C-alpha cells in the first residue's frame, strides 16, 4: 500500500499516519510503501511543494513529515501489527542542492560543458544524475541504504528509476542489506528506448 505521507492525512506526518495503521491492517494491507521521506530540494523546485523525488539529503528525514524518532515509531507500530514498511529510494539522481553537490561534485554525471546534468529524456530539470562509475559514490549510497534499515528498522526499498543505476550496484547493495536482515526490494523502471 503506497503512502504519500504529506497527503495521507490532514497533518501530513508519520505520527498522524501511524494512527491509520490498524485501519490499513483491517483492509488486508501487508506492506506499506512510503514515498520518499527525505528533505525536498529547493533549487529548481517544481511547484510550491516540490517533488519528493528531488532528494536534498539521503540521510535525513523531511522535517515536514516528522523526525527520525517519529519514523522509527511508525515502523515499530507497523511491525507490532504484522505490517512491513519499505521506503522509496531515489538512487539515480538528487536535487540540485543535495549535500553531495557541495561535498562531492565529482560524483555527478557531467554534460559536454562539464556541468551536472538532468536525465536527458524526461522533464526532470529539478534533479541531476549521479555517476555510478565512482566507487566512493557506490559506497556512500550503499551505506545510506543500510542506515535506514539499521536506524529506522525498515524492511526494504521500492527503488525509483532502478534501470538508470547499474545492476551490479543493486546486486552488491542488496547483499549488504541482507547481511543485516532479510529485506524486500521492489524496483520500478520504464525504458524510453
State where each predicted segment sits.
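Short catalytic-loop micro-motif centered on adjacent basic/acidic residues
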Residues: 86, 156-162
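Substrate-binding/catalytic cleft of secreted carbohydrate-active enzymes
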Residues: 161, 185-188
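Substrate-binding/active-site clefts of carbohydrate-active enzymes
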Residues: 6-15, 19-30, 36-152, 172-179, ...
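Short, polar loop motifs at secondary-structure junctions
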Residues: 189-193
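Glycan-recognition and catalytic cores of secretory/periplasmic carbohydrate-active enzymes
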Residues: 167
Amino acid at each position: 500500500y503506497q503512502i504519500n505521507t504529506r497527503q495521507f492525512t490532514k497533518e501530513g506526518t508519520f505520527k498522524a499516519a501511524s494512527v491509520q495503521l490498524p485501519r490499513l491492517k483491517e483492509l488486508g494491507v501487508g506492506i506499506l510503501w512510503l514515498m520518499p521521506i527525505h528533505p525536498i530540494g529547493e533549487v529548481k523546485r517544481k511547484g510550491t511543494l516540490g517533488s519528493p523525488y528531488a532528494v536534498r539529503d539521503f540521510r535525513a528525514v523531511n522535517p515536514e513529515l516528522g523526525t527520525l524518532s517519529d519514523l522509527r515509531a511508525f515502523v515499530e507500530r507497523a511491525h507490532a501489527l504484522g505490517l512491513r514498511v519499505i521506503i522509496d529510494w531515489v538512487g539515480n539522481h538528487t536535487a540540485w542542492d543535495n549535500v553531495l553537490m557541495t561535498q562531492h561534485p565529482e560524483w555527478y554525471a557531467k554534460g559536454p560543458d562539464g556541468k551536472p546534468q538532468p536525465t536527458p529524456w524526461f522533464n526532470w530539470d529539478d534533479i541531476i544524475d549521479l555517476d555510478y562509475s565512482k566507487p566512493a559514490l557506490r559506497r556512500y549510497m550503499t551505506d545510506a541504504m543500510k542506515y535506514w534499515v539499521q536506524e529506522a528498522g525498515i524492511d526494504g526499498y521500492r527503488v525509483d528509476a532502478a534501470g538508470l543505476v547499474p545492476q551490479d550496484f543493486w546486486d552488491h547493495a542488496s547483499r549488504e542489506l541482507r547481511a543485516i536482515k532479510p529485506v524486500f526490494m521492489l524496483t520500478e523502471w520504464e525504458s524510453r528506448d
